[in-house]
Amino acid sequence: MLANDFGTTLIRLLLATLLGLALGFERECHGHDAGLRTHGLVSLSSAMLTLSALELAEAHQDSDPIRVVQGLAQAIGFIAGGLIFVRGGDVRNMTTAASLWMAAAVGITAGAGQYVLVLAGSLIALVLLSLLLLIEKRMGRREKKADDPESGSVTMPNRRGSTVPKRNG
């Protein structure tokens, strides 16, 4: 009876949104286009669809909420796949695509009321996104310069003022 419990519904939606915003904040801080709003909306919409599926399953016994989860996973996979591209032999935006997928998982688990799972998973995801970036930098993995003459690329400013590779030719 989630529809009759406005407080529970609101908590689940807010939790999904806030945790999605936390994931998006990390991406936004590093200049990625899929940032705060995108991650917040993906988490919120996933929670809403999950809550709706649970309501339908409760009202109609022949309804299967797992199909909504499967549909969300496919839809987010399609959107995330659109973010990924290859330039100069390097694959770009894999982490942003994965964090969008995580934002959907946050919304699904928050919408389902799995509070321990959503909080633990979000905490681990934030550690992966922030702490491991520091480790990658120390290992030199993130030290490639876009204006390196050997890479054959140059940079130009993007809408946030940071630089992005510009195609040659």
Tell where the protein language model's regions lie, with residue ranges:
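Alpha-helical transmembrane segments and their membrane-interface exit regions
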Residues: 76, 125-134
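Hydrophobic alpha-helical membrane segments of integral membrane proteins
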Residues: 93-98, 116-121
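Interfacial segments of multi-pass membrane proteins
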Residues: 97-98, 102-114
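Short, amphipathic, aromatic/basic-enriched membrane-interface segments that mark the entry/exit
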Residues: 33-36, 65-66, 85-95
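Hydrophobic alpha-helical membrane segments
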Residues: 74-78, 95-100
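Alpha-helical transmembrane segments and their membrane-interface boundaries
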Residues: 1-68, 112-120, 131-138, 153-169
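Alpha-helical transmembrane-segment detector that highlights a single hydrophobic TM helix
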Residues: 60-84
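Short, Lys/Arg-enriched, Gly/Pro-containing loop segments at transmembrane-helix junctions
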Residues: 139-148
